[in-house]
């Protein structure tokens, strides 16, 4: 039973998270040859103040890649 954990900044829509879960499930089925019913996806949403690069939190300076989680 594959368990896939995703950590990402909060702010994405329910539809985006559902799409991500579906895509990851499909990828696991194809790559690992498992049944889709056995795939578990855990999405952990992080507050911007709980994610930092080089000591600067995403709340202080939004990430430059347009991550969708910046406020």
Give a label for each model feature.
Residues 2-71:
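A domain-level signal for the structural core that forms small-molecule/cofactor-binding pockets
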